[in-house]
Each structure stands twice: as structure tokens, then as C-alpha cells.
UniProtKB/Swiss-Prot annotation:
Lineage: Bacteria, Bacillati, Bacillota, Bacilli, Lactobacillales
Organism domain of life: Bacteria
Gene Ontology CC entries for this record: cytoplasm
Organism annotation: Streptococcus gordonii (strain Challis / ATCC 35105 / BCRC 15272 / CH1 / DL1 / V288)
Functional description taken from the UniProt entry: Peptide chain release factor 2 directs the termination of translation in response to the peptide chain termination codons UGA and UAA.
Family matches, as Pfam families: PCRF, RF-1
Post-translational modification: Methylated by PrmC. Methylation increases the termination efficiency of RF2.
InterPro entries in the cross-refs: PCRF, Pep_chain_release_fac_I, Pep_chain_release_fac_I_sf, PrfB
Localization (cell): Cytoplasm
Family recorded in the similarity comment: Belongs to the prokaryotic/mitochondrial release factor family.
Residue numbers of N5-methylglutamine PTMs: Q249
Name of the protein this chain belongs to: Peptide chain release factor 2
GO function terms (MF aspect): translation release factor activity, codon specific
Length: 364
């Protein structure tokens, strides 16, 4: 590595560190660490063991973030000092290159930590697929997305479970709800929230014309026991029905499927996967809690935007990505401009490039 390459690396590292500093409120981080440390000294801190463990984990993660940033800053300062010496003594080059390699390794790891550091990023995820108008073509597109997300989840080692499945009239799906259980499931899948557009020659059109279909995807974090969402029993209407598997297999002779309607908001959720009515009601309640929590967060975000004067489209109601099968092949994310030509790989669950681009776009 010649000196000009070393200078370029140091300049790039300087920019990346500045980006990290811009995304971190160091004073706020110090204050948050102090608050949690004081909280852990309270006499009744360990009375609620689950909450205490969560607080302890949160404190450790914040401390790690703070310490790692300062370690990277120290490494960068050392590399600049060694660069000054390099002009007079080339024997320091090996040490300088080792410092740069160590710094770049730390920055790569740190960047991923920052990308997945928002609230609930480490939670499990609930993902819903709702085809738009367009009949069989749109419902088949929904089924293609179901396959894509299932393959993505399996490749990541997540436990993927179908919570509710409504088959299409001729092919595909009318709607489906999935759960993804594993580290950072929500943090990775939140990039998929929005409307997905398909352009292809429809296999259901005898004239072989090109069709455009739309399907909306909604993603919510599964809430743990430390987050309480109060739901009054009087506000819930419960309906039961006979449920079956995908395509109508294993139709139950008893009404085990559960549909819950939250009367004040009109939100409807249902679960059919469990063999018992009790199990499906429990799953449906978790889905309802997640939806109500998300609704409250969206209201707060809308209030902040109105105070700022921002005019933004509702994220889950806007087109986020196009999948073009003809006259050329391309998948393009309209938020980040990230695109690939290998549409088959994407449909097989290779979403890492899109997720990485989205997380970096949010960070910046």
C-alpha cells in the first residue's frame, strides 16, 4: 500500500467517523447511561426480574456503543500520528496498516450495530401481506411475496410461522400473516413495509398482455412483556369460525379460528394456525396489541411531522419497490435507488442488499 492509498483510507475513515458522530447524541448517550445506572441502584430494582434484566441488557448495550465509538476515535487519532511519522520513517508503515485494518473492522461492526439500534429492532416480527385490487393476478403476486419472505426467513435461521392464511379464489392469497422469530427479525424486516409493484406478462391472461399488480406489506414488532398495551374487554368483538390450512386443507369441524375486532379503531385481526380456539385467541391478541401500539406510534410521528412542517406520504401506503419481469428484469427500491437485475435471486429471498441499503439510508 503506497502513501496515497493510505491517505485515501484515512480520509474515508474520517468521513465515516463523522457520520457515526452525527448519528450519535453522545451527551444524550452519557445521560441515558447515568439514568440507567441510578435506576439499577434502587432497592426495589430486582423485584421485577424480567424488567430488571431488560434494563441491565440495555445499559450494557449503551455502554458498549459509547466505548466502541471512543476506541475507534483513539485508533483514528493514532493512525493520523503514524501517517505524520511515515513521511520521515517508513518503518512505521506496517504498524499503520495494522491500525487501519483494525479500525475498518471495528467500523464495519459498529455500523451494523447502529443500523439495528432503534427501539424494537431486536424483537420478533409480524408481517402481513395484502394484495391490492386486480383479482387473481394480484393474489398470485401476494403468494409470490409470501414465498420470498418465507425463504428469506429460513435463510436467516428465523422460525417462520403462518398465523393466518386466506386463500385466493383461483390462485394465490387474499391475505396472509406471518411471524418471524429470531435476533433482529423486526430490524431487518421493517424495510419491507409499503407497497410492492409487479410488472410482468400475466400467466392468467390468454392474450399474454403485460400487467401491473400491487401488494401492500405491513410489518410490526412483536411486543414483549415489558410493553403494556391496555385493551378493554368491552372494546373487543370476538367471532369464531372453522379454519383450515393453505388452500383449504385440514378444515376443522369445530370453530377454532378466531377473529377479533377492536371496536374503537375498527382494527381486525384473526388467527387460524392453532388447533384450539384458546391458542388462536392468544395469538390474535398479540397481533392486536402490536397493531394498536404501531397505530399510537404513527400518531406520535404524524404530530412531530406536523410541528416540523414536514409533508410526507404515509410510508406503508406508498410504493417502495418495483419488480419488473418484462421487457427487462430489474428490482428497484424507490427510497434508496438500490437496484439489481437478478429478479429470480430476489424472489428466492435474497433481500440483503435492499435491507442494507435501506438501513444505511435511514441512518444517514
Amino acid at each position: 500500500m503506497d502513501i496515497s492509498e493510505i491517505r485515501q483510507k484515512i480520509d474515508a475513515n474520517r468521513e465515516k467517523l463523522a457520520s457515526f458522530r452525527g448519528s450519535l447524541d453522545l451527551e444524550g448517550l452519557e445521560e441515558e447511561i447515568a439514568i440507567l445506572e441510578n435506576k439499577m441502584t434502587e432497592p426495589d430494582f430486582w423485584d421485577d426480574n424480567i424488567a430488571a434484566q431488560k434494563t441491565s441488557q440495555e445499559l450494557n448495550e449503551l455502554k458498549q456503543t459509547y466505548e466502541n465509538f471512543h476506541q475507534m476515535t483513539d485508533l483514528f487519532d493514532e493512525s493520523e500520528i503514524l501517517l505524520d511519522f511515515l513521511a520521515e520513517d517508513d518503518s512505521v508503515q506496517e504498524e499503520l496498516e495494522e491500525k487501519l485494518a483494525e479500525l475498518e473492522k471495528m467500523m464495519t461492526s459498529y455500523e451494523m450495530t447502529l443500523l439495528l439500534s432503534e427501539p424494537y429492532d431486536n424483537n420478533n416480527a409480524i408481517l402481513e401481506i395484502h394484495p391490492g385490487s386486480g383479482g387473481t393476478e394480484a393474489q398470485d403476486w401476494g403468494d409470490m411475496l409470501l414465498r420470498m419472505y418465507t425463504r428469506f426467513g429460513n435463510a436467516k435461521g428465523f422460525k417462520v410461522e403462518v398465523l393466518d392464511y386466506q386463500a385466493g379464489d383461483e390462485a394465490g392469497i387474499k391475505s396472509v400473516t406471518l411471524s418471524f422469530e429470531g435476533p433482529h427479525a423486526y430490524g431487518l424486516l421493517k424495510s419491507e413495509m409499503g407497497v410492492h409493484r409487479l410488472v410482468r406478462i400475466s400467466p392468467f391472461d390468454s392474450a399474454k398482455r403485460r400487467h401491473t399488480s400491487f401488494t401492500s406489506v405491513e410489518v410490526m414488532p412483536e411486543l414483549d412483556d415489558t410493553i403494556e398495551v391496555e385493551i378493554r374487554e368491552d372494546d373487543i368483538k370476538m367471532d369464531t369460525f372453522r379454519s383450515g390450512g393453505a388452500g383449504g386443507q385440514n378444515v376443522n369441524k369445530v370453530s377454532t379460528g378466531v377473529r377479533l375486532t377492536h371496536i374503537p379503531t375498527g382494527i381486525v385481526v384473526q388467527s387460524t394456525v392453532d388447533r384450539t380456539q384458546y391458542g388462536n385467541r392468544d395469538r390474535a391478541m398479540k397481533m392486536l396489541q402490536a397493531k394498536l401500539y404501531q397505530l399510537e406510534q404513527e400518531k406520535k410521528a404524524a404530530e412531530v411531522d406536523s410541528l416540523k412542517g414536514d409533508k410526507k406520504e404515509i410510508s406503508w401506503g406508498s410504493q417502495i419497490r418495483s419488480y419488473v419481469f418484462t421487457p427487462y428484469t430489474m428490482v428497484k427500491d424507490h427510497r434508496t435507488s438500490y437496484e439489481v437485475a437478478q429478479v429470480d435471486k430476489v424472489m428466492d429471498g435474497d433481500l440483503d442488499g435492499f435491507i442494507d441499503a435501506y438501513l444505511k439510508w435511514r441512518l444517514n
